């Protein structure tokens, strides 16, 4: 699972989002509305880059890379190549037309000979940047299709002016026929309007544009198909359907498995090649075994092999360099079964990891003292490791928008019997913080100077600690009752799981145990996170939503659920209030200890819902508290936010690694640079990591 950067809610504007019904919570860093331009930098590194649409591009510094050994640098180089080879997979998973649309746009952008300063061409450039960022034509966070601001006539004429050989034409297809096929997908707002639809009462597959199910497959058919394939009494159940597309063939359902000689095979073959190149540079035999098992999984597509790989990966803890590469998180599938492809390469920040190790070493204490029913607690917490890492490269569904924390694997039985790894991505958190300073957000939305001072004093540490608690302990806590289907919460699994991990972190942030462990400086520190969390959940995350829309994304639903539930349940005692000052709405917290008790009660209920597989309970919580938006408050928040000129979403440009080789082809050094522009990086990736055909 992952945690994400929430929004301009705290001093660092880092707000984390937990993930879906998978427990791999990547702290998804949807660094929401945090910064525009960093005002004062303590170093000369340029953290902020260009801004377009609702997105601010950032850069992250790979601190310590130059001090690594040549072996470690070379390992990172080849693992990074493997991390970039799967880019086309995500585009295709997000929509069956995405690769063709991207290639049409790129060809016009690079080869167009007309007026490149015209309104239409500039609009095409902006649209292409958004397609690159979202790995498709739907918003990376809100899931809605974004509309081109250039005309169909302009695009058709431009496509006729470039070489037809560079266009994604079907065999025998004309340029006009290509336009007739693709333009409705791009320009008609009523066709494929949502990438992942979660609206209650609708067929979530037929109304979603994602490419995890073939044309004509219904939600009822898919649910029955996978229900029949589950072994009800299997103590080690595989994650059914994780790595395949479900299609209809001659009226019957069948899976197209993502593997070397199956669907996406041409991309997977290149991933395997680079994993093989990395293998000799592994630091331990355990890490070599991880790569061997991952390659075996990529070749066979066998999900039992995937569990074996996950087990080996959890046990491989002695290496400085680590990585994730594969089909991981299920946010993009409305049924929460099928995983998008993602990758990250990283190395441990040894000094910062001392913080997370204090939590993992005390995991049993936190489990024993949580406010949930003892029936839902783990009697013995196993194999929880936690570390702070430095990201070296981001790929797939972790790029350009990424996570600030990751907790894997997502398999419930592996987490229970083997354990899990939790990471907080320190250099990404640092980049968000550096870019967010001085953007005016706090002054606009935080109720008073005393609260702002509280946030400035404790906020950054609170954010890091909440991420650690969320990933390391929250996702790793609790257990399913025997016989509970791990997929029983369906579309509500992700927001419920993210809420569970967030609540675990919120509850324990206020505990004296953290002061005892030296993780918080005093008993007042937790209040900064409580305030920013409630402000974000009740108000400021709404800047990411278009007027009239509901909350769709799992992390946003989770935050709204927690904040609105606590607000409503504490209303009689005025625990939290929404007050007016000068015509503006603010969050006011009157009783922080009572708010903690409310978080504990909701944690107990959400753990019960998950442990028992209570679909009706999950549906009630999410639909009642996590979906609807107050239109008047929304209008006010949008107007106030617009004046700040802050982009509500953030993403990263990757560094560039160059291998220096001798006459025999041996790597003698690996250089890192941070100068590549967003356009140049995306065009290079489309050229050098062009791994899939137009239609898959």
Model-derived features with residue positions:
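Post-HEXXH active-site segment of zinc metalloproteases
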Residues: 478-499
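Catalytic Zn2+-binding segment of zinc metalloproteases
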Residues: 472-484, 508, 512
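Single conserved hydrophobic/aromatic residue that forms the stacking wall/gate
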Residues: 1-13
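Extended, compositionally biased alpha-helical segments that mediate assembly or anchoring
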Residues: 591, 595-696
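N-terminal-proximal low-complexity accessory segments that begin disordered
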Residues: 43-104
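Long, well-structured alpha-helical subdomains associated
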Residues: 61, 506-609
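An active-site-proximal "capping" alpha-helix that borders the catalytic cofactor pocket
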Residues: 69, 284, 494-511
């Amino acid at each position: 699972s992952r945690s994400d950067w929430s929004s301009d809610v705290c001093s660092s504007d880092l707000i984390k989002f937990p993930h879906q019904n998978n427990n791999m919570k990547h702290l998804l860093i949807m660094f929401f509305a945090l910064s525009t331009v960093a005002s004062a930098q303590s170093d000369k590194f340029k953290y902020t880059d260009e801004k377009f649409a609702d997105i601010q591009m950032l850069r992250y510094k790979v601190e310590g890379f130059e001090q690594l050994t040549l072996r470690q640098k070379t390992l990172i180089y080849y693992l990074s190549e493997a991390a970039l080879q799967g880019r086309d997979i995500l585009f295709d998973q997000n929509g069956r037309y995405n690769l063709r649309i991207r290639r049409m746009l790129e060809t016009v952008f690079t080869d167009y000979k007309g007026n490149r300063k015209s309104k239409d061409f500039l609009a095409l450039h902006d649209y292409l940047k958004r397609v690159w960022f979202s790995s498709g034509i739907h918003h990376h966070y809100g899931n809605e299709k974004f509309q081109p601001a250039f005309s169909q006539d302009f695009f058709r004429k431009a496509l006729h002016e470039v070489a037809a050989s560079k266009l994604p034409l079907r065999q025998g297809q004309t340029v006009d026929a290509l336009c007739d096929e693709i333009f409705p997908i791009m320009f008609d707002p009523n066709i494929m309007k949502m990438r992942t639809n979660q609206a209650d009462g609708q067929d979530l597959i037929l109304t979603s544009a994602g490419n995890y199910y073939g044309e004509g497959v219904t939600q009822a058919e898919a649910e029955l198909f996978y229900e029949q394939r589950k072994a009800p009494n299997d103590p080690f159940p595989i994650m059914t359907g994780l790595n395949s597309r479900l299609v209809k063939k001659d009226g019957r359902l069948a899976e197209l498995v993502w593997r070397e000689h199956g669907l996406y095979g041409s991309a997977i073959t290149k991933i395997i090649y680079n994993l093989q190149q990395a293998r000799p540079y592994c630091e331990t035999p355990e890490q070599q075994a991880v790569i061997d098992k991952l390659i075996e999984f990529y070749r066979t597509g066998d999900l039992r092999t995937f569990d074996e790989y996950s087990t080996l990966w959890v046990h491989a803890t002695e290496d400085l360099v680590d990585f994730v590469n594969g089909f991981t998180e299920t946010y993009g599938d409305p049924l929460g079964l099928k995983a998008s492809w993602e990758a990250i390469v990283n190395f441990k920040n040894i000094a910062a990891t001392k913080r997370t190790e204090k939590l993992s070493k005390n995991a049993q204490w936190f489990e024993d003292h949580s406010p949930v029913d003892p029936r839902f607690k783990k009697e013995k917490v196993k194999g929880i490791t936690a570390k702070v890492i430095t990201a070296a490269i981001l790929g797939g569904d972790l790029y350009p928008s990424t996570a600030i924390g990751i907790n894997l694997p997502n398999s419930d039985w592996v987490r229970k019997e083997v354990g899990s790894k939790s990471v907080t991505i320190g250099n990404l958190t640092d980049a968000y913080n550096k870019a967010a300073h001085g953007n005016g957000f706090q002054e606009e939305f935080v109720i008073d100077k005393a609260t702002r001072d509280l946030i400035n004093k404790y906020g950054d540490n609170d954010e890091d600690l909440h991420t650690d608690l969320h990933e390391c302990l929250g996702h790793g806590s609790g257990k399913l009752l025997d016989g509970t289907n791990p997929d029983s919460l369906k579309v509500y699994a992700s927001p419920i799981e993210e809420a569970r991990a967030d609540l675990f972190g919120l509850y324990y942030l206020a505990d004296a145990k953290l002061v005892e462990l030296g993780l918080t400086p005093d008993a007042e520190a937790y209040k900064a996170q409580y305030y920013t969390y409630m402000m974000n959940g009740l108000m400021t995350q709404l800047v990411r939503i278009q007027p009239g829309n509901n909350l769709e994304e799992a992390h946003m639903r989770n935050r709204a659920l927690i904040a609105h539930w606590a607000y409503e349940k504490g209303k009689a005692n005025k625990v939290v209030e929404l007050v007016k000052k000068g015509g503006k709405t603010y969050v006011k917290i009157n009783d922080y200890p009572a708010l903690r008790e409310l978080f504990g009660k909701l944690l107990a209920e959400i753990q019960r819902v998950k442990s028992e597989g209570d679909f009706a309970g999950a549906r009630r919580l999410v639909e009642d508290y996590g979906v609807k938006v107050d239109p008047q408050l929304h209008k006010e928040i949008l107007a106030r936010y617009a004046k700040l000129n802050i982009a509500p979403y953030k993403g990263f440009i990757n560094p560039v690694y160059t291998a220096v080789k001798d006459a025999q082809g041996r790597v003698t050094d690996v250089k890192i640079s941070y100068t590549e522009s967003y356009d140049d990086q995306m065009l290079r990736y489309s050229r050098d990591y062009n791994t899939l055909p137009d239609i898959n």
